Curated annotation (Swiss-Prot):
Mg(2+) binds at residues 8, 10, 212. The keyword Hydrolase applies. Its EC number is 3.6.1.-. The active site is at residue 8. InterPro entries: Cof, HAD-like_sf, HAD-SF_hydro_IIB, HAD_sf, HMP-PP_phosphatase. The gene is cof. The keyword Hydrolase applies. It is an enzyme of class 3 (hydrolase). GO terms for molecular function: 4-amino-5-hydroxymethyl-2-methylpyrimidine diphosphatase activity; magnesium ion binding; phosphatase activity. This is HMP-PP phosphatase. It holds the Pfam family Hydrolase_3. Keywords: Hydrolase, Magnesium, Metal-binding. Belongs to the HAD-like hydrolase superfamily. Cof family. It catalyses: 4-amino-2-methyl-5-(diphosphooxymethyl)pyrimidine + H2O = 4-amino-2-methyl-5-(phosphooxymethyl)pyrimidine + phosphate + H(+).
């Protein structure tokens, strides 16, 4: 039986109203009651996640910022990685050929120089919001990650620019089709979950994980059982063909899977099909 379950949030647990569905909440509480450690692994900020979980009655370990931070259930930091100061300065001062908005995440919040209220819709449950700033007002140290937000095609073109200019100094991933992230080199949910597992005297083989986007790839591929959402990005399904595909997020596919798994933990096939 797996001893830890790690869940992505957007596209995996969160419904279109950006809340966890009632059936899924029930399944997660049952999982915790069965002695499985809950872990929420997300690109969202720690402050955002605490707001979401406070409305759900759930508690668990947090992997936030796509692996840049790991905290215990009380919010105590266990692990963290930041972007190098010189890379932050380079990204902020380079005139990239793009219309994408740029967002920088630090322990004290989410910062941007562009006011786009539509971006706050996904954070209505938690009340988390961006802080408008001039880039030269922020320290170059203590920065977790960058996010660029635009159409997918524009971000594909921007990613090519970033990779050409920065080479192997950072990692890049699409956490959604319209969100390109720049992360510290070697930082991802899989590495963060490995650090957490070691802290808990577990191995990745003791873990199951659920996800839908490319920022879930390393986590899903390294755990004892990785489950891909039915609504996952096509690229994720293509790159992890060996993993089971379960139901869609809007159908609360995680709950459906967990209800079957809790009654038959040694099930070797996905009950979705």
């Amino acid at each position: 039986m797996y001893r830890l379950a790690a869940f992505d949030m957007d596209g995996t647990l969160l419904m279109r109203d950006h809340k966890i569905g009632s059936i899924t909440l029930n399944a997660l509480h049952q999982l915790a009651d069965a002695g499985v450690t809950l872990t929420f692994a997300t690109g969202r900020h720690y402050l955002d996640m605490k707001g979401i979980l406070s409305h759900s009655g759930l508690n668990g370990y947090l992997i936030t910022g796509n692996g840049t931070r790991v905290c215990d259930a009380e919010g105590n930091p266990l692990y963290g990685m930041d972007l190098p100061a010189e890379l932050v300065e380079f990204v902020l001062r380079t005139p990239w050929q793009t219309n994408a908005s740029i967002h920088l995440f630090r322990d004290d919040g989410w910062f941007t120089d562009r006011n786009d209220p539509d971006l706050l819709i996904a954070h209505t449950t938690s009340g988390f919001h961006f802080q408008l700033t001039e880039w030269d007002e922020l320290p170059l140290t203590g920065n977790h990650k960058f996010c660029f937000i635009a159409s997918h095609q524009e971000l594909v073109e921007l990613k090519a620019q970033l990779e050409q200019q920065m080479g192997g100094e950072a990692d890049f991933c699409f956490s959604a089709t319209d969100c390109l992230e720049v992360l510290p080199r070697g930082c991802n949910k899989g590495v963060a979950l490995e650090k957490l597992s070691h802290h808990l005297d577990l191995t990745l083989a003791d873990c199951m994980a659920f996800g839908d986007a490319m920022n879930d790839k390393e986590m899903l591929s390294r755990v004892g059982r990785g489950l891909v959402m039915g609504n996952a990005l096509p690229q994720l399904k293509q790159e992890l063909p060996q993993l089971q595909i379960i139901g869609r997020c809007e159908q609360q596919g995680v709950a459906h899977y967990l209800h079957h798994w809790l009654s038959s933990p040694h099930l070797t096939y996905s009950p979705e099909f």
